[in-house]
């Protein structure tokens, strides 16, 4: 087992998760005692205790006072955030996870957008317009750096879009443009979900954010993906402005089908880091 981590806690967390996944600590089993496990992993008991508590919160483990720590049937006890972890563990199934994500978004979007356009029409229009303006400025800018220099939302973008220390300038531009476009795509769906008035829809997107960023940062490296998304955003704006909410299922389903066609081509040449754990 080769594990890359930036800290002892990160190493311990990955060690335990991979051991659960690979059957060393299978679901339903009991973890070794704290002292034994800390020596096995090579971290302090304090660090291990913090990691175990975090994994328990995430649904991997059940900690009971005075009893051994039990490994859960994690697919029954974990939330949406586990999907990004599964991308790094189950590499052969990664494209299926992406397709599940796209299908789920297509299925729920007509529901929350209809509510958003009815209950929060003005805020919904503002959100879509801001995303369109920002994405148009991004794709028309001479470089990502020029876009950031002129963007009124630069601070927010830079909080989410991180540099990868890419030395090749052309690749750096491609990576940053894709990440930034994805930042706005996520913003559009997540904010419209909250505009619906049902916070559950917004929280679903919060739970998917890490996976969304992983997928979108690759998907939006394709100019065709960005062009298609912008056309979709403009259709959404028109639908919101005219009040023709009954058109939403058709508009969203059509976008889902077209974006799936692009993805089906892109998944044939996935980058080597697509399923890497970068934490």
Curated annotation (Swiss-Prot):
Organism equals Vibrio parahaemolyticus serotype O3:K6 (strain RIMD 2210633)
Give the protein name, as stated in the record: Fatty acid metabolism regulator protein
Assembly and oligomerization: Homodimer.
Establish whether keyword Cytoplasm is in the entry.
yes
**Molecular function terms, GO-annotated:** DNA binding; DNA-binding transcription factor activity; fatty-acyl-CoA binding
What residues are annotated to bind DNA? 34-53
> Superkingdom, according to UniProt?
Bacteria
Q: What does this protein do?
A: Multifunctional regulator of fatty acid metabolism.
- Pfam families associated with the record: FadR_C, GntR
* Annotated keywords: Activator, Cytoplasm, DNA-binding, Fatty acid metabolism, Lipid metabolism, Repressor, Transcription, Transcription regulation
Q: Which NCBIfam families match?
A: fadR_gamma (TIGR02812), PRK04984.1 (NF003444)
Q: Which Gene3D superfamilies match?
A: GntR ligand-binding domain-like (1.20.120.530), Winged helix-like DNA-binding domain superfamily/Winged helix DNA-binding domain (1.10.10.10)
Cellular component terms per the entry's GO annotation: cytoplasm
Compartments where found: Cytoplasm
Domain HTH gntR-type positions: 6-74
HAMAP family reported for this sequence: HTH_FadR
Q: What is the first-listed, main subcellular location in coarse terms?
A: cytoplasm
Which GO biological process annotations does it have? Answer: fatty acid metabolic process; regulation of fatty acid metabolic process
């Amino acid at each position: 087992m080769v594990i890359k981590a930036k800290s002892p806690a990160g190493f311990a967390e990955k060690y335990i998760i991979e051991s659960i996944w690979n059957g060393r600590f299978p679901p339903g089993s009991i973890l070794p005692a704290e002292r034994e496990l800390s020596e096995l992993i090579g971290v302090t008991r304090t660090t291990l205790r913090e990691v175990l508590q975090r994994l328990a919160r995430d649904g991997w483990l059940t900690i009971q006072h005075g009893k051994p720590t039990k490994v859960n049937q994690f697919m029954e006890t974990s939330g949406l955030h586990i999907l990004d972890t599964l991308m790094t563990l189950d590499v052969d199934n990664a494209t299926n996870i992406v397709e599940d994500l796209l299908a789920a978004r297509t299925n729920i979007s007509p529901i929350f957008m209809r509510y958003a356009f009815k209950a929060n029409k003005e805020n919904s229009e503002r959100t879509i317009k801001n995303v369109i303006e920002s994405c148009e400025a991004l794709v028309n800018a001479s470089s990502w750096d020029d876009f950031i220099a002129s963007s009124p939302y630069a601070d927010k973008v830079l909080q989410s879009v991180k540099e990868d220390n890419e030395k090749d300038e052309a690749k750096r531009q491609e990576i940053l443009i894709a990440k930034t476009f994805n930042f706005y795509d996520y913003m559009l769906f997540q904010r419209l979900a909250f505009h619906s008035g049902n916070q559950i829809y917004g929280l679903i997107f919060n739970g998917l954010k890490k996976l969304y960023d992983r997928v979108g940062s690759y998907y939006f490296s394709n100019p065709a993906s960005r062009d298609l998304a912008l056309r979709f955003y403009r259709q959404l704006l028109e639908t919101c402005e005219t009040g023709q909410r009954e058109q939403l299922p058709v508009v969203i389903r059509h976008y889902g089908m077209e974006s799936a066609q692009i993805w089906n081509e892109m998944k044939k040449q996935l980058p080597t880091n697509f399923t890497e754990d970068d934490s």
